[in-house]
A protein has these predicted regions:
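Structured loop/turn residues at beta-strand edges in well-structured enzyme cores
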Residues: 80, 98, 126, 159-162
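Short, glycine-/small-residue-rich phosphate/pyrophosphate-handling segment
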Residues: 117-159
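Structural beta-sheet core signal
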Residues: 12, 87, 131-135, 166
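Short, glycine/serine-rich, charged loops/turns that create anion-binding
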Residues: 17-18, 138-139, 171
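Conserved nucleotide-sugar donor-interacting segment of glycosyltransferase catalytic cores
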Residues: 109-119
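Active-site donor-binding loop signature of nucleotide-sugar glycosyltransferases
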Residues: 43, 136, 169-171
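N-terminal beta1-alpha1-beta2 submodule of the flavodoxin-like/Rossmannoid cofactor-binding fold
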Residues: 1-89, 94-109, 188-194
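Glycine-rich phosphate/pyrophosphate-binding loop and the adjoining helix
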Residues: 2-4, 142, 149-194
């Protein structure tokens, strides 16, 4: 689905890499509750450009010229035009998969996803009013200010997305954990609360 237009859609940013991903399972449950088309961006299938000096100079030049229709900014336009955002990212090493960080670096474009005031304060330019972050974790040590906190801060402070929610299932790999029961409980909560 081409998204460089005014169509209404939910953008699903999929940072899950494993077949049978538990995070993707919960995201699919949540997505099934939404109306309208879903555009999926699979980060493990996305080739991000190397952010070397030549790339940054080219990017900065395009931004300075206001050439926001350049293909380099496709992901940023797609993000900015979405009516709702869903991010699925397993909890890895106190954060999320590296591809998600690359994605955010790619879409942080002054003039598309945000702008600065004269005082240097970012103001969001994104259409979405809600971002839902879906994650699972094998353990139980999951400080929300790590991976989710980073995404929440970007969404609220840069993109203008005020409603940022977290759906999670944790303790999935603890000895004697009933993984299926934990996932079913999370799915029931999604069905009941969203």
């Amino acid at each position: 689905m081409e998204t460089d237009n005014k169509d209404t859609y939910t953008l699903f940013i999929n940072a899950c890499v494993k077949k049978g991903s538990r995070t993707k399972r919960l995201a699919d449950c949540f997505l099934s509750k939404l109306d309208g088309p879903v555009v999926e961006t699979r980060l493990h299938e996305t080739s991000f450009p190397l952010a070397d000096e030549a790339f940054l100079n080219r990017r900065d030049s395009l931004i300075a010229k206001g050439d926001f229709n350049n293909p380099l900014f496709y992901l940023a336009r797609q993000f900015a035009q979405a009516d709702e955002i869903v991010v699925a990212a397993p909890y890895w090493d106190l954060s999320f998969p590296a591809a998600l960080k690359q994605y955010f670096e790619q879409i942080n474009v002054t003039g598309i996803t945000f702008r600065y005031t004269a005082e240097g304060t970012p103001v969001g330019l994104c259409r979405a009013k809600r971002l839902t972050y879906v994650m699972t974790c094998g353990g139980t040590f999951v400080p929300e200010d790590y991976g989710f906190g980073y995404v929440k801060t970007l969404a609220q402070s840069f993109y203008g997305i005020s409603d940022v929610r977290l759906i999670k299932a944790v303790g999935l790999d603890i000895d004697d954990a009933d993984t299926e029961a934990i996932l079913r409980k999370a799915e029931d909560q999604i069905r009941d609360n969203y």
